């Protein structure tokens, strides 16, 4: 196919001859609606449509509100800024902080303390009344006079060292001279003025820092729940070796436990003072130091301020 035939196909109008290839190219480029353009237009349109469909965004899954709804929400609730909040969590994801609410003290602490002291005073009065119904020692502690104690031990080879009464029992220690390897020590006690008696064995105590020529024994005696007031409660000590028996009877007077009389007058005075004190609703002025000890000579415990009220019936050590 020559150039003349191509031009006849492209433009059916008659053309002068001869025709050069340059003329064919110029006619193709300058044609108003060349056939090639119309031939290729369907492919370009299809390509453009595919590109548009390929890059079209997907529809969002979140439903958007209309402008009217947004306006209504804005009119009903004004826009407020959210406050920043910091939360701490522990290793298990639980809250790390705990909130405790404390109420302010509405009552005076000093008033509460005075009420407590008043209640303690009532309890002490009851304890004193209960103690006065029991027994008390009718003799001083033997070891309080150490020289006399040593002389009696040297003379009798056995001597009561100390004795105390705790609730419904009597406990004490006994010193004996080490004159024999085998020793048997007893406490002979009576609760009915020696109409009958009971021998209570003593227990040997190991003397870590004691002397080699003296041994120590201890005893504990349970007192009966009731003893007639006219009956005497007394005891003495016996120390037996393989061939001898030694006694300590407090120089013939025995060791007596006396009935303590109930001082009802003193208890009634204290009870009346406490009753009047509570009825008035007042508390005496008390001064407290920084360590919490009461400094008063006329407060709840005036005997704390005097050495004269300290008993001397404790062991000498």
From Swiss-Prot:
Function text: Acts as a glycogen-targeting subunit for PP1 and regulates its activity. Activates glycogen synthase, reduces glycogen phosphorylase activity and limits glycogen breakdown.
GO CC list: protein phosphatase type 1 complex
Start and end residues of each CBM21 domain: 150-258
Subunit structure: Interacts with PPP1CC catalytic subunit of PP1 and associates with glycogen. Forms complexes with glycogen phosphorylase, glycogen synthase and phosphorylase kinase which is necessary for its regulation of PP1 activity.
Protein name: Protein phosphatase 1 regulatory subunit 3C-B
GO biological process entries: glycogen biosynthetic process; glycogen metabolic process; regulation of glycogen biosynthetic process
Record keywords, A-Z: Carbohydrate metabolism, Glycogen metabolism
GO molecular function: glycogen binding; protein phosphatase 1 binding; protein phosphatase binding
InterPro entries assigned: CBM21_dom, CBM21_dom_sf, Pase-1_reg-su_3B/C/D_met, PP1_3C, PP1_regulatory_subunit_3
Gene for this chain: ppp1r3cb
Organism per entry: Danio rerio (Zebrafish)
Domain statement: The N-terminal region is required for binding to PP1, the central region is required for binding to glycogen and the C-terminal region is required for binding to glycogen phosphorylase, glycogen synthase and phosphorylase kinase.
PANTHER family: PROTEIN PHOSPHATASE 1 REGULATORY SUBUNIT, PROTEIN PHOSPHATASE 1 REGULATORY SUBUNIT 3C
UniProt-listed Gene3D superfamilies: Carbohydrate binding type-21 domain
